[in-house]
Amino acid sequence: SRDQYDTVVVDAFGSGGSVPYQLTTDEFVAALHARLDARGVVAVNLASAIEGERGLLAQAMVATYKKHFEQVTLFQLDPGVDPAMAQSLMLVALRGSGAPSFASADPELRHYLARRWKGAVPEQDVLTDDFAPVDYFFNKAVF
């Protein structure tokens, strides 16, 4: 089908805890982007640091999503964790040209929006079907 979606959640882990590489590549993200409506949102659950060598997975995934989406943001599920340490993250990618508002009158929503990573994410190569060292990056993050 050629259905369009407003929201897609990618929450898949292979054996050992890593995201299957097929769900991280430029080709997958391009196909995902094509199936979202004009204001669509993708949320990706991943385990990685943000900074340093342990952050290679998150850095590469941010680079890959930025190739296709106007807005890409990371959220720390526990903002008290050192950004150089492995942690649970949510990558959120938005279609549309307008900058998102991370303000809300709802106190519970404000609590979650406050977990947005406001620092820079180091540059990394885009992941492709021919170059996706996801397991290597994941192992660097957690071991």
Annotate each language-model stretch with its function.
Residues R39-L46:
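Conserved beta-strand signature within the Rossmann-like core of class I S-adenosyl-L-methionine
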Residues G16-T24:
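Glycine/threonine-rich flexible loop motifs
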Residues S1-V9:
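A short acidic, Gly/Pro-enriched loop at the edge of an enzyme's catalytic core
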Residues L46-A58:
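Conserved class I S-adenosyl-L-methionine
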Residues T24-A38:
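A short glycine-rich, Lys/Arg-flanked "PGG" loop and its adjoining helix->strand segment in the class I
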